Amino acid sequence: MKQLFLVLFAAFSISQLAACLLENRRWRAINKPFLMLTLLLWYCAAAQQVNPLFAAGPALSLLGDVLLIFHGLFKFGGTAFFGAHLCYIAAFWRNISLRQPLWLLAALGYMLVVGFVLHTVRSGMKKKMFALAVVYLSALSAMSFSALLQFVSVGGAAALVFAGSLLFVASDSLIALREFRRDIPIPKPYFLVMATYIPAQLLIALGMSWLG
């Protein structure tokens, strides 16, 4: 059964990327919810031991994907993904040891990245939206930072999770630029967002299915 779910995820992923390339908005909207649905089903079937904290991440991402289809629900979609990042953080921290000194330098690096993204998009945001962006990007960077600490602590499959987290940061940074800095041209922005988001979620799920 897990092979079937993975094949379905791959098929919906290819379909979504094609819809983005062809700029077919209706096709994108119909196809999008099936990405996280099939990935979540695959994780539950493939994991040696299903981690409920982690499984809540793809579930909330599915909710976020559905909400973001509708333009008026952007904040609600962002809130769902904010919750997904918190679930990922909680799941990653079960495998983390802070005995490695790398975490201090890594924390500084993530702060610089968040600061750069916020500085870039600030001119296109109202104050309230900017405050929400600060909170969201802090959670996103904390998720990726936690994935790095997990990799430093346990190695192995945690490398996939960390790589996925970096792609997630890239994907959400592209969304921020697309929504709030339209003066910066991004070729095929929907395609680039999904081309980073899809492998991000897949790598995170693959790694966590082995780590437990």
Stretch-by-stretch model annotation:
Residues M1-G212:
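Polytopic alpha-helical membrane-helix bundles and their juxtamembrane interface segments
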